[in-house]
């Protein structure tokens, strides 16, 4: 049974919802799944002014904070981040930047990797974000899994990974589940 880590950053809960759907899909694909979040770097007094964050704070904080060194313990890692100015959030970037030792020791080489994102605007740079998130995975020598052509992709997601605009709709969640299941199936074949 493949072990999969779904790791995400979210402030308003949209990326968290996608993370949960990705995890459901991976479980459906037969994997053992852990869902964790990256450390939040925005000061609490600023976060508390964001009504979207206040609504989901307790649920977000219920997820364990991941440590970079634990990535090597999984067969597959699926990263999720909100889109910020066409790239991943600084919190996710900082977390990935802390994997330098794993890179030097080639600890993630051959592991399966995939990505997902959410943003607030239809043309807010989701595909650019997905691509920016894939680059470090390539650098680590990970085996990248995207989404094959499917009717669900016509309205939600991308070949590069799952995505949503605003609160994920049902088709967004279906594509996220598809991604999780596909990663689980590929990881199982490689284990």
From Swiss-Prot:
SUPFAM superfamilies: Flavoproteins. It catalyses: a quinone + NADH + H(+) = a quinol + NAD(+); a quinone + NADPH + H(+) = a quinol + NADP(+). One of its GO terms (cellular component) is membrane. InterPro entries: Flavodoxin/NO_synth, Flavodoxin_CS, Flavoprotein-like_sf, Flavoprotein_WrbA-like. GO terms for molecular function: electron transfer activity; FMN binding; NADH:ubiquinone reductase (non-electrogenic) activity; NADPH dehydrogenase (quinone) activity. Binds 1 FMN per monomer. Residues 4-184 form the Flavodoxin-like domain. Its EC number is 1.6.5.2. Its cofactor is FMN. It is an enzyme of class 1 (oxidoreductase). Disulfide bonds: none annotated. Keywords: Flavoprotein, FMN, NAD, Nucleotide-binding, Oxidoreductase. FMN binds at residues 10-15, 83-85, 118-124. Pfam families: Flavodoxin_1. Homodimer and homotetramer; in equilibrium. It seems to function in response to environmental stress when various electron transfer chains are affected or when the environment is highly oxidizing. It reduces quinones to the hydroquinone state to prevent interaction of the semiquinone with O2 and production of superoxide. It prefers NADH over NADPH. Belongs to the WrbA family. This is NAD(P)H dehydrogenase (quinone). It comes from Archaeoglobus fulgidus (strain ATCC 49558 / DSM 4304 / JCM 9628 / NBRC 100126 / VC-16). The lineage of its organism: Archaea, Methanobacteriati, Methanobacteriota, Archaeoglobi, Archaeoglobales.
């Amino acid at each position: 049974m493949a072990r999969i880590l779904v790791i995400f950053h979210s402030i308003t809960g949209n990326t968290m919802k996608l993370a949960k759907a990705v995890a459901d899909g991976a479980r459906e694909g037969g994997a053992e799944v852990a869902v964790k979040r990256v450390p939040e770097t925005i000061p609490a007094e600023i976060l508390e002014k964001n009504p979207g964050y206040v609504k989901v704070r307790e649920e977000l904080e219920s997820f364990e904070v991941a440590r970079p060194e634990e990535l090597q313990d999984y067969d597959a890692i699926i990263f999720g981040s909100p889109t910020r100015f066409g790239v991943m959030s600084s919190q996710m970037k900082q977390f990935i930047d802390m994997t330098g030792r794993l890179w030097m020791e080639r600890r993630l080489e051959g592991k399966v990797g995939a990505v997902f994102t959410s943003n607030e605007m239809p043309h807010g740079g989701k595909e650019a974000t997905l691509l920016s998130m894939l680059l470090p995975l390539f650098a680590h020598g990970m085996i990248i899994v995207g989404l094959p052509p499917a009717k669900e992709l016509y309205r939600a997601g991308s070949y590069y990974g799952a995505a949503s605009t605003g609160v994920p709709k049902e088709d967004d969640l279906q594509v996220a589940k598809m991604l999780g299941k596909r990663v689980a199936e590929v990881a199982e074949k490689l284990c």
